[in-house]
Amino acid sequence: MVPFRWGLLLGCLGSALGPGAQAQFPRVCMTVGSLQAKECCPPLGAEPSNVCGSLEGRGRCAEVQADTRPWSGPYVLRNQDDRERWPRKFFDRTCRCTGNFAGYNCGDCKFGWTGPNCDQKKPLVVRQNIHSLTAQEREQFLGALDLAKNTPHPDYVITTQHWLGLLGPNGTQPQIANCSIYDLFVWLHYYSVRDTLLGPGRPYKAIDFSHQGPAFVTWHRYHLLWLERALQRLTGNESFAVPYWNFATGRNECDVCTDQLLGAARPDDPTLISQNSRFSSWEIVCDSLDDYNRRVTLCNGTYEGLLRRNQVGRNSEKLPSLKDIEDCLSLKQFDNPPFFQNSTFSFRNALEGFDKADGTLDSQVMSLHNLVHSFLNGTSALPHSAANDPVFVVLHSFTDAIFDEWMKRFSPPVDAWPQELAPIGHNRMYNMVPFFPPVTNEELFLTADQLGYSYAIDLPVSVEGTPDWTTTLSVVMGMLVVLVGLSALLLFLQYRRLRKGYTPLMETQLSHKRYTEEA
């Protein structure tokens, strides 16, 4: 099986979002002066001296802490990729916020907190099954996605060149682009999986910061939280929650691929989205990975064609089943060495889909997350382009729900996550690429309620793995029935013997009847 390789990109401008929408880099820091100084510590508000909200006790400008522990895996280069020791190829100093403050200038609150001083717990936002949404809730979700696709981001921009060429050929023009909110969501994913650029036509492909390792679960969790907060602000609804798609149907059809939800297939070309769906006009970004590698450049947000799904020819493939979810949730180890796509009996690797759902390894089999992407095919089939499809949002919401259920069942200690020798980007204290300000994997290795949200869901429990009182009672009752039966048989035999007396052994006639035959 070819390992998943995914991606995303675009440019951003103004709307109703705030400084907590943490993505690539804040526009205010993408100046020649800031890039040369490698410092992104903007003031909060109009007062220039209020750097990082320091006058209000919200934060200060500080040295970036980047993980330097050794990594393992196929990436063996050093100082060749601008994502190493993220984000120090770009900035050495950023705002470090205190308490529950957050954001590139400490002007926001951490997930799950609110109030002027970020000291008030927000009510949990509840992520529901997309099929359980009311007509109004469904329209709000779909409309918010479409609005995000067409609304420039107010605060963040993306880079269109790697760090050595970031200031342009003359060193005076930062190579950046604006993007829509949703396309920035796509770009973040693309950037996390793109190849290392070594020269024209010389990509180094053995690298992935968001897949094939422990960070798969935390990276996608933060990615989804980022979008959810952006949509909350875009809609003016702080209780807005992205729904999930329970893909564990075991069927060979996509039940969210309808015109009422995320778009049916177009009758005259089933690889395109039905023209009755708002998503039929969505164009994709960051799809031409080979072209970027040839030109030694990054995705710049140019539209590259329509969104596609291609389930034609996939009829023999079926989505995961509830039994697969049950098997995955029975795995007690979060991850196992080598913390890569060949780890066995690893909850993370089974959920990601490189292991079978029960944790055994079969290189010819895809399961769970990987299987769903393969099933959708088209734009969803490759990591660098998959997030273009809005199904990505509800697919990963359900994947995160499974992760959250595992966290609640097993309450793993923090050292269940390796501090070192995971693939690059996947050590516990590595700053997740390309989120900014920096945030580590460890900070997301929590239950969802600690991050301000929950799921309206009941996931299956393995009877074998988690015996309860009903199982014990069934066993006891079965034993009692057997004892009563034996007692009755003994009494009957005793009765027969008393009536007929004894028959000498030599005179006994042995029966040749089988147990399944009538006497």
UniProtKB/Swiss-Prot annotation:
E.C. number(s) listed in UniProt: 5.3.3.12
Post-translational modification, as annotated: Glycosylated.
Pathway: Pigment biosynthesis; melanin biosynthesis
Record: residues binding Zn(2+) B: H369, H373, H396
One example GO MF annotation: dopachrome isomerase activity
Cited InterPro entries: Di-copper_centre_dom_sf (IPR008922), Tyrosinase/Hemocyanin (IPR050316), Tyrosinase_Cu-bd (IPR002227)
Keyword Transmembrane: yes
Topology of the protein relative to the lipid bilayer: Single-pass type I membrane protein
Annotated transmembrane regions: 473-493
Annotated glycosylation sites: N170, N178, N237, N300, N342, N377
Cofactor binding note: Binds 2 Zn(2+) ions per subunit.
Catalyzed reaction equations: L-dopachrome = 5,6-dihydroxyindole-2-carboxylate
Pfam families xref list: Tyrosinase (PF00264)
Subcellular location: Melanosome membrane; Melanosome
Chain residues that bind Zn(2+) A: H189, H211, H220
Cofactor section: Zn(2+)
Principal EC category: isomerase
Source organism, top-level taxon: Eukaryota
Residue intervals on the Lumenal, melanosome side: 24-472
A Gene Ontology biological process term: response to blue light
Cellular component annotations (GO), alphabetically ordered: cytosol; melanosome; melanosome membrane; plasma membrane
Signal peptide, first to last residue: 1-23
Main location: membrane
Entry similarity comment: Belongs to the tyrosinase family.
Role noted for this protein: Plays a role in melanin biosynthesis. Catalyzes the conversion of L-dopachrome into 5,6-dihydroxyindole-2-carboxylic acid (DHICA).
Protein name: L-dopachrome tautomerase
Underlying gene: DCT
